[in-house]
Amino acid sequence: MDTKETQFKELFDKNSKIIYHLCYGYTGDSDSANDLMQETFIKVWQNLDGFRNQSQISTWIYRIAINTCLSYLRVEKRKVTDEISDFILENTAEPISEKEEQVSLLYKCISQLEENERIIITLVLDEVPYPEIAEISGISEGNLRVKIHRIKHRLTDIYNRYERL
């Protein structure tokens, strides 16, 4: 395997799970998230030689993923899938664990946030370091901490509204 292939394989192994979760946060759909993750890594492969080391390579990959998701949403014009998802969940033969339900509800709540809030909270959930999140989102680390605090409060409010239903 040549150097580029080896480097790409390492990047994919290290970042694919986080990129999937980031994409899932945008789409709320596993198939679309997988497609967007694949598209992201195709772009990474195509542009790997052009990476200029001006930031961490993972930051560069996150930015590609975010731009890919935003392009997708612009083209697809986000569809309301809550009713379909609920129908599928109600009619699924397999029992769903309480943890899976909570994770599903969390992503449903995240999808209610504004775009920049979705990006930030998804990266926080994927345990990306704050300095890197600040760089990706283009804000100071201090401002990031305030935003995260506010996002958590909004998520709690949204989650509590769903829990009451």
Regions from the language model: what does each represent?
Residues 120-121:
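A short pre-motif secondary-structure segment
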Residues 2, 39-56, 75-76:
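Sigma70-family region 2
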